[in-house]
Structure formats: structure tokens, C-alpha cells
């Protein structure tokens, strides 16, 4: 297996620190608002990484943190006129609801920053003792960037350029413009904790260093996150952690690609900013997941109605292959060429686009066997399709449930069944004009009928 390491900017053979075990940390949400499409990309990307590593037999210990104290959180709580913990608790519940709909498995641990204040303070004390941090007169504590010669090794930024660029916003308490806060002195009315430097709260970067090393040890296998976190957040994590522990922080750094909307950067100012909730009001959750998985995790993804519609159509093809067939028992299905091809592409830096192509090849086999009347071969291939789909978090629904999923249609399942019965009654009475009218009315509302000798089934259009 080879994984692209942001640190070395190349694919590397993946070797775990401990045989058969993977320790992975991913930066999670700052819970001041609902999760957006960019968050969905990261959630799904590292869910697939976790699923595939487990599929390959690794014991994965996956930690994804929650930032539950931050400037943005305090500002939003103040705007809402609520206690900050009420805001964060509400947003955490919403996040869990969103990720469950997207089929994202829960991490092994989900540490919250506010539960690690003692660990954060202890790490800051280590940094001060080692000459890597200093307390300012105003109660802030800063990391001394120039004390870490390797600063910039992840982002490939030069310290002298960062210092020069930061001079426009020099704070008097800092010794160097590029230094960053480890501890922020309390402001009037803000939540704070007691520390050796007075009342205050932690900086964002030190939170992740303290949580990750506490949960996974001084050195662990994989650290991941969104593209916007590479610098300064992950760069600062490396500096803090390696100065505090004296050990290499992380072996493999992984970053998901950015999301664009209609080929433009997603931003609130452009009016193209979508929360997961807003998207799931328009599209089935599995279609959204399929859309995200269809591209390589490092690639830039363009969100558009056309692309989501295409994702819906192609996912529908896979479910069509499974419709009306009972997959063979897993124990009765040996490893196939498709399994081997799937492993080959996924071993190449989690190439989910290639894996999706394998799923469609299996679906083509199912359709071929059914045309040939070889139901047993079709059942075995269906088991392979469901098995491989599970690694991507796809194709685990009953096909009928997928086809009949309600995504905001004006018609409920009960309404549709009643209209199908009315159509059947009209056909029985040889009133074919009325039967056709009902069929056309349903089609206009996005409901497609499929007639067979066994009766009539229906599905919602994915267009």
C-alpha cells in the first residue's frame, strides 16, 4: 500500500509503527455552526480511509477531535445571546446527525478541547521549560517559532518569508512576528480557566497537539484534515509537538482536496455556501456520499446540480443491478478478480475513483449473468458488489428503499401506492386512458413505474 505524504510530497510505502495497528488523528469541527460541504468531504474521505484499512486487516484507532472553545464559538454565542456550551452542544448533536446520514462511522475517540485543559497547560509548561515558548506581560503565552529550525517543513514555507510577511500585523507582546499563541489571557466576560499565567484559554493549535499525543502517543501513523489546515495549523502542531516531546510527531500527513461550487470557491460572500443539511434536503444522502467518493480524496471537487444529478444516475445503475436479487452468502463467494483489482486501486493512495469503476464492472457482470439466465452467478456477483460497496460506505440499503427514498417530494410513499392501486383498478376496468394519465402524472412528479409479471414497482427519479 502506498499513501501520498504531504510532508514528503510523494507516495510512500505505508509502514505502521506497530505491526497490524494504525493510529490516526483527524482534525474535526470547530462547532460554532452547521457542518458544510467542505466538512462533508473530510468526514467521508477519512471514513473511507478507516474502512479500507480495516478491510485490509488493520486494527485502526481513529481519533477525530472537536474544537469546542474558540474565538468563533464565543463570538457566535454572544451574537445569539446564549451560553457557549449550549451552542457547542447543539452543533455537536447536529454534526452527529449529519454524519450518520452520510454513513460516516463514529471515530474510536472524539475528544473535546475543553476536557484537556490540564494536558494543554502541561504541554505549554514543557515548551516554556525547553525554551520554545514564553509568557508575555499581558498573560498570553507564545510559541517561539525561531526556536524550531524545522519550522515550515510541512508547508515548505521559509521562516524568513513568514516573519517578513507578518510584520504588518505585529503584536507588541510577541518577540517575533511569526510567533503564535499557545495561551490567551482572559478578556472581560469570556470563559476562562486558571493557569500558571493567570486566567485564560488555550490557543487552537496547542489543543490538537495535546489531544492527539494524549490519545495516540508522542508519535503516530497518520494525521489528516482539510486543505486549509495545512498551514498554519498543522505546521504549528508539528512545531509544538516535536519541541514538547523530542520525537517525530507524525509519519504520514494526509490532506483532502478543496470543494468548489460551480467552479468557484465556496464562500458565504458569493452566496454559494451550502451546509450538509441544505444539500440533504435536495439529494439523497447516499447520492451525496457517492458524489464525494467518486473523486480521489486529494483532488479538487466541483459541486454543481449537474454533477449531483450525474452521481444520482450512476449510483442508480448500481442499485438497478442489485434490484430483485438476493446476494449469495458471503461464505459462499471466493475472492474474485474484481476483489483483487479493487485492492490494487485502493492500495494506490485510496483511489476511490478507480474503486467506483470496479463496482460498475461488477454490476455489468450481474446484468450479463441475468440476461444469460445464470441466477447463481448473478447472486455471487451481487455479493461481491455489496461487499466492495461496503468498503466505500455504499450499496448497503435495500434497493427498494433506495429507489423510494423521499427527498422532499410532494408525494409520500402512501400517496404513490394509492395512485398505483388506482392505476391498477383503471387497467382492470380497461380504462387505459385513466391508467396512462395516472402514470404520466406520477412521472411528472418524478416517480417512475416499472411493470412486470410480478406487479408494479416504483422509484423516484434521480435527475
Curated annotation (Swiss-Prot):
It catalyses: tRNA(Cys) + L-cysteine + ATP = L-cysteinyl-tRNA(Cys) + AMP + diphosphate. A motif ('HIGH' region) lies at residues 29-39. It comes from the Bacteria. GO terms for molecular function: ATP binding; cysteine-tRNA ligase activity; zinc ion binding. Zn(2+) binds at residues 27, 208, 233, 237. The keyword Nucleotide-binding applies. One of its GO terms (biological process) is cysteinyl-tRNA aminoacylation. Its EC number is 6.1.1.16. A motif ('KMSKS' region) lies at residues 265-269. Its cofactor is Zn(2+). ATP binds at residue 268. Monomer. This is Cysteine--tRNA ligase.
Amino acid at each position: 500500500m502506498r499513501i501520498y505524504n504531504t510532508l514528503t510530497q510523494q507516495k510512500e510505502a505505508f509502514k505502521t509503527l506497530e505491526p497490524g495497528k494504525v493510529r490516526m488523528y483527524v482534525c474535526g469541527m470547530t462547532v460554532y455552526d452547521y457542518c458544510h460541504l467542505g466538512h462533508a468531504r473530510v468526514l467521508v474521505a477519512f471514513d473511507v480511509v478507516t474502512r479500507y484499512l480495516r478491510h485490509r486487516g488493520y486494527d485502526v484507532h481513529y481519533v477525530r477531535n472537536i474544537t469546542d472553545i474558540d474565538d468563533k464559538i464565543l463570538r457566535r454565542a454572544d451574537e445569539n445571546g446564549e451560553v457557549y456550551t449550549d451552542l457547542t452542544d447543539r452543533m455537536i448533536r447536529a454534526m452527529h446527525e449529519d454524519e450518520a446520514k452520510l454513513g460516516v462511522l463514529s471515530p474510536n475517540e472524539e475528544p473535546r478541547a475543553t476536557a484537556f485543559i490540564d494536558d494543554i497547560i502541561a504541554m505549554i509548561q514543557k515548551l516554556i521549560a525547553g525554551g520554545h515558548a514564553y509568557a508575555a506581560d499581558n498573560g498570553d503565552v507564545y510559541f517561539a517559532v525561531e526556536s524550531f529550525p524545522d519550522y515550515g517543513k510541512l508547508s515548505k514555507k521559509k521562516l524568513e518569508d513568514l516573519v517578513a510577511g507578518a510584520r504588518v500585523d505585529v503584536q507588541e507582546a510577541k518577540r517575533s512576528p511569526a510567533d503564535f499563541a499557545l495561551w490567551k489571557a482572559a478578556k472581560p466576560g469570556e470563559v476562562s480557566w486558571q493557569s500558571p499565567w493567570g486566567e485564560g484559554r488555550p490557543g487552537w493549535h496547542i489543543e490538537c497537539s495535546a489531544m492527539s499525543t494524549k490519545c495516540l502517543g508522542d508519535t503516530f501513523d497518520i494525521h489528516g484534515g482539510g486543505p486549509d489546515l495545512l498551514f498554519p495549523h498543522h505546521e504549528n502542531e508539528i512545531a509544538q509537538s516535536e519541541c514538547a516531546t523530542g520525537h517525530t510527531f507524525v509519519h504520514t500527513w494526509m490532506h483532502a482536496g478543496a470543494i468548489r461550487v460551480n467552479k468557484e470557491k465556496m464562500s458565504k460572500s458569493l452566496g454559494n455556501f451550502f451546509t450538509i443539511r441544505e444539500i440533504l434536503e435536495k439529494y439523497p444522502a447516499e447520492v451525496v456520499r457517492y458524489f464525494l467518493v467518486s473523486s480521489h480524496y486529494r483532488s479538487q471537487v466541483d459541486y454543481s446540480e449537474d454533477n449531483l444529478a450525474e452521481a444520482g444516475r450512476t449510483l442508480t445503475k448500481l442499485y438497478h443491478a442489485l434490484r430483485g436479487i438476493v446476494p449469495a452468502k458471503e461464505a459462499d463467494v471466493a475472492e474474485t478478480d474484481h476483489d483483487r483489482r479493487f485492492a490494487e486501486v485502493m492500495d494506490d493512495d485510496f483511489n476511490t475513483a478507480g474503486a467506483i469503476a470496479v463496482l460498475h464492472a461488477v454490476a455489468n457482470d450481474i446484468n450479463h449473468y441475468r440476461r444469460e439466465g445464470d441466477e447463481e452467478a448473478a447472486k455471487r456477483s451481487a455479493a461481491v458488489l455489496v461487499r466492495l460497496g461496503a468498503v466505500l460506505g455504499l450499496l448497503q440499503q435495500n434497493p427498494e428503499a433506495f429507489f423510494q427514498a423521499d427527498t422532499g417530494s410532494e408525494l409520500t410513499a402512501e400517496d404513490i401506492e394509492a395512485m398505483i392501486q388506482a392505476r391498477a383498478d383503471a387497467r382492470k376496468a380497461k380504462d387505459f386512458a385513466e391508467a396512462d394519465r395516472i402514470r404520466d402524472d406520477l412521472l411528472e412528479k418524478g416517480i417512475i413505474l416499472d411493470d412486470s409479471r410480478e406487479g408494479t414497482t416504483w422509484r423516484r427519479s434521480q435527475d
